[in-house]
């Protein structure tokens, strides 16, 4: 059974634009509900789909953070080319790391990093995450358990250069967070087991913006956009965006 591939999306809402960035091994569906909510509130939202994501896992390991960063940057320029002068960005996990990187690379109206890591717990945790993604993908293709196991054995032999590169990107962004002057709203799920949640405090403390907030979601885990407090999250992000000094 072929799995329907998630695609980039653009929801035309109004003159204010928000770039939405998904996480590592995730896809644009991770930020789709948030995009729909913001569209209803008058924001135009665009979410790119990173190369090697939402496709068979064998393709993921042949791409890397440089490709994904380029996809994020292209998403920003996509909105610019559509005539949007002021762009805010919200990103989940690795998308949150990229949202911070955009904050010191190009003009950004406001930044919402959600469960964004500033250091990796361990390569092992990330490696397990990739294996879980691979297994889940293969199961959803309707393959038998035997077939999935056989393919997983092969998959485990694939060199994972991606993980080292990912760590390097995260640590590079961490070293530059103090170059961010755009208003920032740091979002973190209290029950996040995927990253070290101290990352949220690091971002909040090191961002130089005079306008910054942090909120801990007590009932949520890592993929906070799908978790039980998502409605509250949508409202909080909207409230933050409304406070920005838009020129329209």
Describe the residue ranges of each PLM region:
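Active-site nucleophile loop of the alpha/beta-hydrolase fold
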Residues: 112-122
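Catalytic active-site module of serine/aspartate enzymes centered on a nucleophile-bearing elbow/loop
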Residues: 219-248
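Conserved alpha/beta-hydrolase
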Residues: 39-57
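Gly/Ala-rich beta-loop-alpha elbow adjacent to hydrolase catalytic centers
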Residues: 91-95, 99
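Short beta-strand/loop motif that positions the catalytic acidic residue
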Residues: 180, 186-188, 192
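Catalytic nucleophile-loop/oxyanion-hole region of alpha/beta-hydrolase
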Residues: 56-84
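Catalytic histidine neighborhood in serine/cysteine hydrolases
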Residues: 201, 205-223
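Short alpha-helix in the alpha/beta-hydrolase fold that links the catalytic acid
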Residues: 34, 182, 196-205
């Amino acid at each position: 059974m072929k799995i329907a591939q998630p695609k980039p999306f653009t929801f035309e809402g109004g003159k204010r634009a928000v770039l939405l960035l998904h996480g590592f091994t995730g896809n644009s569906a991770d930020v789709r509900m948030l995009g729909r909510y913001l569209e209803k509130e008058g924001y135009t939202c665009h979410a790119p789909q990173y190369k090697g994501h939402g496709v068979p896992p064998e393709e993921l390991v042949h791409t890397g953070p440089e490709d994904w960063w380029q996809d994020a940057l292209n998403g920003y320029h996509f909105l610019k080319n559509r005539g949007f002068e002021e762009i805010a960005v919200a990103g989940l996990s690795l998308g949150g790391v990229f949202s911070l990187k955009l904050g010191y690379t190009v003009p950004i109206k406001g930044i919402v990093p959600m469960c964004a890591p500033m250091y990796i717990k361990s390569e092992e945790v990330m490696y397990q995450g990739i294996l879980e993604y691979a297994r889940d993908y293969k199961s959803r293709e309707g393959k038998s358990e035997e077939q999935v196991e056989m393919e997983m054995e092969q998959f485990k032999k694939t060199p994972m250069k991606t993980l080292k590169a990912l760590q390097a990107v995260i640590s590079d962004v961490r070293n530059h967070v103090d170059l961010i002057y755009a208003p920032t709203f740091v979002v973190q799920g209290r029950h996040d087991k995927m990253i070290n949640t101290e990352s949220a405090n690091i971002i909040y403390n090191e961002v130089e913006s005079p306008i910054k907030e942090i909120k801990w979601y007590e009932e949520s885990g890592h993929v906070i956009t799908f978790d039980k407090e998502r409605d509250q999250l949508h409202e909080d992000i909207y409230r933050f965006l409304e406070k920005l000094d838009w020129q329209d």
